[in-house]
Amino acid sequence: AEEAREETMRMLNIYADFFENVLAMPVIKGRKTDKEKFNGAEETYTVECMMHDHKALQAGTSHYFGDGFAKAFDITFAGKDNQPHHPHQTSWGVSTRMIGGIIMTHGDDNGLVLPPRIAPVQVVVIPVAAHKPGVLDAAAALRDRLKAAGIRSKMDDSDNSPGWKFAEYEMKGVPCL
């Protein structure tokens, strides 16, 4: 029983850490009331992500089932005493609402700014006055230094105007232009 309870809390903490440190979303961890908990669970814990409108989005849950489901489905294992025992079970998960939460947290009227840790491209180097001597070479050198530092980066040396490029990559969610 203790191991299952520890697993329930471990997963809750993993989710909270992921939301805060990877997705850059503030969270509140808590325990659901008896009326709110998962049907059949002894305890349900939640990670609530805080949105800009001051509302919370339930983004992940972790449940401790005890041995109730194991008894209902006659699930047993042989213990150290070679006798059958019902395991204590857990269940935990996040859902696609996490994607909506990212958009609600990091989006605005101009698009989405993805958190740097999940952005496919973290930095786009946009040369301005690319027709002037040395500008493209300097921009390429900057891109290369960023890549060498492990930053997912690219340079846009297309014929589109700098303004178009800034708008395009802002809309695509690139964190740094």
Which residue ranges define each predicted feature?
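NTP/phosphate- and nucleic-acid-binding module
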Residues: 1-177
